């Protein structure tokens, strides 16, 4: 298990992209799983749990998966990243930007390829809505970033507890 792994298990049955996996510690429905096939790591999602067996739907070709293939459970649910650049990009079901995947691998989507969904290098204009002295709580808007006619609201994360006092705007 690596440092990002919450729990682990191994494949006991495979039916196409549906795997039955015996696991060793608590997991939850909807949790992200990584199926390790040689050097590749295939993404899947826990869709059902019965006792110590989880059914995992793998989102790509499961060639090479066999009895005892290791599976790592990541401790978080499948999620999509939101932000500027989302509206101007075409994605696959795992939120891989297809144009960048094609640049990296050619016209055929290779399994085990996961690219960041949003461009981390592009600079975006930020318009603050909060002012110095404002006290914000989770879910409150700090400001926005325009993308075309759409405004991406930048908010205090819902994972933040307590209040934030704005001291200055950069």
What are these regions (language model features)?
Residues 1-170:
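Peripheral, non-AAA+ core regions of ATP-driven protein-machinery
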């Amino acid at each position: 298990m690596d440092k990002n792994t919450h729990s682990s298990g191994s494949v006991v049955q495979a039916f196409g992209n549906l795997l039955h996996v015996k696991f060793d510690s608590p997991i939850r429905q909807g949790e992200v799983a990584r199926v390790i096939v040689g050097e590749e790591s295939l993404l899947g999602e826990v869709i059902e749990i019965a006792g110590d067996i989880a059914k995992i739907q793998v989102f790509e070709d499961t060639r090479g998966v066999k009895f005892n293939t290791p599976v790592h459970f990541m401790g978080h649910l499948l999620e999509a990243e939101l932000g500027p650049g989302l509206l101007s990009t075409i994605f696959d079901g795992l939120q891989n930007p297809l144009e960048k995947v094609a640049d990296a691998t050619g016209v055929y989507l290779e399994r085990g390829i996961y690219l960041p969904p949003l461009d981390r290098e592009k600079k975006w204009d930020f318009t603050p809505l909060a002012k110095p002295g404002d006290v914000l709580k989770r879910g409150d808007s700090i400001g926005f970033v325009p993308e075309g006619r759409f405004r991406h609201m930048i908010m205090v994360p819902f994972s933040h507890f307590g209040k934030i006092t704005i001291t200055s705007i950069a």
